[in-house]
């Protein structure tokens, strides 16, 4: 990524948290000197009709999110105010920008126009969210305000991009379910059957993914549930880009599993759920081919750096979407405490030649580590301070609000901000995590794309990065180049910069040149010489015979 602007006053007020390496098992993985990953364009997956690669079944009840006291859903979300979205609307509202949300599906809502993009879980249309995650992510990106703020006028007045391929946006709320299912456990973090351990080869089902909302924190105080606002009452759920169009692609879910699931251990939570790195790759290609100009991926797979598995198909898909189809790809950095995820070192003062500390990476976050094509997003709190549990790594590009989150319910359509307890003695779990930080940045990307449609995907990322509020060191592995500033991204005089990431081309694997045709010149000369000699000898013999005959 390009270096950030050196502007006084744009340093974040937050200082980076002290590094504590967290492992999910007793074995702490050794650091690995890994470079940014290369990609092989020959591995781009075909864009077939979305569907599962094996029979799937429903294994859990759908999640029913609730409303807790804090944050107050009757007020604007603190993150909305922190990054000053309402002022950014003076310059852009993301009018007509197609934003693909590769997640757990999006339930239609009158405040959230959404286009069906397909379903890699059950082969449906993607307009169903059993995990109450994709709908919340989409709410942060593009929900229309209700009551507290008026709907802004579309900016720019004319959409800069054609509508996405497929049916027109769905704006009607779905029919209410006949029976409300009991609450399911809150969507656990990413489901990688490989634990953080020294380098055994990845298991066959490594790379399974799930929503990257934060895991429960037993040290937090319990937030009591409160009644939601009555239907139609003003609420604080407001999207960053309310005139963008969501393309919903259901790729992952904790409520579904293969008909013949494998298990990584006796704990049922370790069973492989729906969603893998390969299905993310296919979803990325499909989203790009539908015309998405921003692709939000709020799911994360964490693998040990010593054995990151075969990610060639995913890398090729990201390359294709970003460079061939010109889509801005935004991904959650991941949360320390999710399955397989842990903080990487921040900086090695003994190796200033590697300022992002790639050589000490212990855990890879995918797709974030494909930083030539992906803008990875870390999380800050409501005051702009770095979240200690936001996963650090050299791929983190920027940060955005990741706490005090609210969104629209996939069931009733009203405001929600937490998951209920799943077992006796557990607490309500307010929404938090880098999933929602990525959604903020996807909304900002939609604002920038609408205002500057001539910029390439990488130039849009460059503008977001260069206008961010830098951390004290200018850049670090927790916040990247700092907290996003939508107003600055839309108004600062920032050179467009390179059309592609400068280092990207050097990491593209090109097919080997075909071998040169065989050189038969020596053989041909020899054959010609032998033929000439033979012809001469034959001519002399015939001439001698003719003379004797006379």
From Swiss-Prot:
EC number: 3.4.21.-
Bias (Pro residues): 168-190
Enzyme class name: hydrolase
Family: Belongs to the peptidase S8 family.
Keyword annotations of the record: Cell membrane, Hydrolase, Membrane, Protease, Serine protease, Signal, Transmembrane, Transmembrane helix
The protein's name: Mycosin-2
Transmembrane helix recorded as keyword: yes
Gene for this chain: mycP2
Domain Peptidase S8: start-end pairs: 79-490
SUPFAM superfamilies: Subtilisin-like
Signal sequence bounds: 1-33
Residue positions of the active site: 103, 133, 435
